[in-house]
C-alpha cells in the first residue's frame, strides 16, 4: 500500500503543529514535521547530517532537499513497516520551495500519493506574535523577531508559489488560521470529514 500524504503548509506561527496534533488524534494520521525531523537529526550525535543541518538552520536557510526527503521517507517506511494500516501521513512544513517540490516529485513519484494541501492562511503580524509568545517557553532558537522576519520572508518568496501551483491543480484546502484554535479545528474537521 502506498502512503497517502497531506501536505500541511502555512507561515511560521500559523498553528500547523497544534492542528496536526488534533488531526492525528481524531483521524489516525501520522504527523511528520519536516522541521522536527531535521531538529532531531541535528541533535543526534551519530547522524551523518547533523552538522550540516545545524549550519543551515542557524542561517535561516532551507536544508538541502535530499536530506529532508530521505528523513521523511525513512519515517514513512518505518511507520508502515510497523503497522501496514498506518498509511496516512500529514507532512508539515514541506515542500517549502520549488526545489523541495521537484525533489519530492523525482524521489517519491509513484511511491506516495498527495491527497491535498492543507493551507493555514494567517496574517504575518499574528504569526509573529504567536511565535514570540511560543519562544518564551519553546526554547526554539529561531523564535525571535529577527529570525521570524527572515522566516516569513523566505516563506513568502518560496512557499507561497508552491501553494499557488497546487491551487491551479485544485488541490488546496484553505483555512483561515487567524481564528482561535477551536474554530480553526472546526474548519479542519469539515475538510477531513469529507476527504477522509
Curated annotation (Swiss-Prot):
Catalyzes the phosphorylation of pyrimidine nucleoside monophosphates at the expense of ATP. Plays an important role in de novo pyrimidine nucleotide biosynthesis. Has preference for UMP and CMP as phosphate acceptors. Also displays broad nucleoside diphosphate kinase activity. A ribonucleoside 5'-phosphate binds at residues 39, 61-63, 93-96, 140, 151. CDD domains: ADK. It comes from Rattus norvegicus (Rat). The modification N6-acetyllysine is found at residues 43, 55. Its EC number is 2.7.4.14, 2.7.4.6. It is an enzyme of class 2 (transferase). CMP binds at residue 100. GO terms for biological process: 'de novo' pyrimidine nucleobase biosynthetic process; CDP biosynthetic process; dCDP biosynthetic process; dUDP biosynthetic process; ovulation cycle process; phthalate metabolic process; UDP biosynthetic process. It catalyses: CMP + ATP = CDP + ADP; dCMP + ATP = dCDP + ADP; UMP + ATP = UDP + ADP; a 2'-deoxyribonucleoside 5'-diphosphate + ATP = a 2'-deoxyribonucleoside 5'-triphosphate + ADP. This is UMP-CMP kinase. Consists of three domains, a large central CORE domain and two small peripheral domains, NMPbind and LID, which undergo movements during catalysis. The LID domain closes over the site of phosphoryl transfer upon ATP binding. Assembling and dissambling the active center during each catalytic cycle provides an effective means to prevent ATP hydrolysis.
Amino acid at each position: 500500500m502506498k502512503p497517502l500524504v497531506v501536505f500541511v503548509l502555512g507561515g511560521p506561527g500559523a498553528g500547523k503543529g497544534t492542528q496536526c496534533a488534533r488531526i492525528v488524534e481524531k483521524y489516525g494520521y501520522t504527523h511528520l514535521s519536516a522541521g522536527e525531523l531535521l531538529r532531531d537529526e541535528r541533535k543526534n550525535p551519530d547522524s551523518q547530517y547533523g552538522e550540516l543541518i545545524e549550519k543551515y538552520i542557524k542561517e535561516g536557510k532551507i536544508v538541502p532537499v535530499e536530506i529532508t526527503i530521505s528523513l521523511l521517507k525513512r519515517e514513512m517506511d518505518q511507520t508502515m513497516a510497523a503497522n501496514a494500516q498506518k498509511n496516512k501521513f500529514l507532512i508539515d512544513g514541506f515542500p517549502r520551495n520549488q526545489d523541495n517540490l521537484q525533489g519530492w516529485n523525482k524521489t517519491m513519484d509513484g511511491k506516495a500519493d498527495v491527497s491535498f494541501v492543507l493551507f493555514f492562511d494567517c496574517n504575518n503580524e499574528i504569526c509573529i506574535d504567536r511565535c514570540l509568545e511560543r519562544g518564551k517557553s519553546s526554547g526554539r532558537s529561531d523564535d525571535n523577531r529577527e529570525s521570524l522576519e527572515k522566516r516569513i520572508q523566505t516563506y513568502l518568496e518560496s512557499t507561497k508559489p508552491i501553494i499557488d501551483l497546487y491551487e491551479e491543480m485544485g488541490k488546496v484546502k484553505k483555512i483561515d488560521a487567524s481564528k482561535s484554535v477551536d474554530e480553526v479545528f472546526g474548519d479542519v474537521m469539515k475538510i477531513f470529514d469529507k476527504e477522509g
